[in-house]
Regions:
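Active-site-proximal alpha-helix that buttresses catalytic centers in soluble enzyme cores
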Residues: 1-342
Length: 342
């Protein structure tokens, strides 16, 4: 007998702001070969000798700035999304995290124990990147194939320019815009340039020439940069915001390798130096507010902008539990269930 279910997947969070919990989380996160994609021996050395001795304390302090009485903002919001979606669909809905708790392995085992035969895997990443969308899918399929390889699975593809996703972005963001804003900055999570090249199936197109993201190419199906540009273009088109009052940047770089640019922190300082006074910043790569939006942009970003002359930087909240975003997820689940009977 068929039993269907959907699995919402997000990144994850430490269990608390304690340095020990943050260290455990960072160790798991940065041990992922699709995140820190270097030689395994070098990765271990970097973690043990460079990153884990100092970064957990710094990150714990940052997490303490955003932690709520309910816990991690990402986990709290993800649970709200899960509950809202569950209440609007007939199928069972589960929530899992790539790192931390509830772990992918735990949730997959629960899905199996509950007798699910058909699973709709829904990575909550609009854009394809090996360090987010890809690793979430690979980890989930590894757990399924190890435990119940006969389970039938379907996958929500990156939805970076899906009209309903763009509409949800517009619906959630536009109420925060003001007529006297000088600029709307789209700040996407950054990734190393080598990740773009590794995700290019041709190994010859992405970042090989200036127009690589403009001219249509099959490589765009797995090109994070192209997909971020498309989200921005689609948002501008649907919202009606003048393109000349927008900009794009990439945040959260780690280590010294070249990452996608321009870098958000550099851009915020430049905007202040150039006399731009009032900006809004939205982060479309994130569907839920988290450390990278609340602290990195809403706190540190404000300081970076103001220290060079900027006056007002406001973080535009992510879609979080906005009805249009919840409707997007509900509709995708319903469409999937309908496809099973066709």
């Amino acid at each position: 007998m068929r039993k269907t279910a959907a699995l919402l997947l997000n990144l994850g969070s430490p269990d608390s702001t304690k340095v020990t919990d943050v260290r455990k989380y960072l160790d798991e996160f940065l041990s992922d070969e699709r995140v820190l994609d270097v030689n395994p021996v070098l990765r271990k050395l970097l973690l043990k000798l460079v990153i884990l001795p100092r970064r957990p304390k710094e990150s714990a302090e940052a997490y303490s700035e955003v932690w709520t009485d309910e816990g991690s903002p990402l986990i709290v919001t993800s649970k709200k999304q899960h509950n809202l979606v569950s209440n609007q669909v007939e199928t069972s809905v589960y929530l899992g995290m790539r790192y931390g708790s509830p772990s992918t392995a735990e949730v997959v085992q629960q899905i199996i124990d509950d007798g699910v035969t058909d699973l709709f895997i829904m990575p909550l990443y609009p854009h394809y990147a090996m360090s987010s969308y890809e690793t979430a899918v690979v980890k989930t399929m590894e757990e399924i194939n190890t435990r119940k390889p006969e389970m039938k699975t379907s996958l929500l593809q990156p939805f970076y320019k899906d009209d309903d996703y763009i509409q949800a972005l517009v619906d959630s963001a536009m109420p925060h815009m003001e007529d006297d804003d000088d600029l709307l900055l789209f700040s996407y999570h950054g990734i190393p340039e080598r990740h773009i090249r590794k995700s290019d199936p041709s190994h010859a197109h992405c970042l090989a020439r200036p127009d690589c993201c403009v001219n249509p190419n099959p490589c765009h199906a797995t090109c994070y940069k192209h997909q971020c540009l498309e989200t921005t273009r689609s948002f501008i088109e649907k919202s009606g915001i003048p393109e000349e009052k927008t900009a794009i940047s990439f945040q959260s770089r780690l280590l010294r390798d070249p990452w996608l640019g321009p870098y958000t922190d550099f851009e915020l300082k430049r905007f202040g130096e150039e006399g731009i006074k009032k900006i809004k910043v939205m982060c479309p790569a994130f569907v839920s507010d988290c450390l990278e939006t609340i602290e990195e942009i809403g706190m540190t970003g404000v300081e970076q902008f103001q220290e060079t002359g900027g006056e007002s930087l406001s973080l535009v909240p992510c879609m979080n539990d906005h009805p249009s975003w919840i409707n997007f997820l509900v509709n995708r689940i319903n469409q999937w269930e309908k496809s099973l009977t066709e």
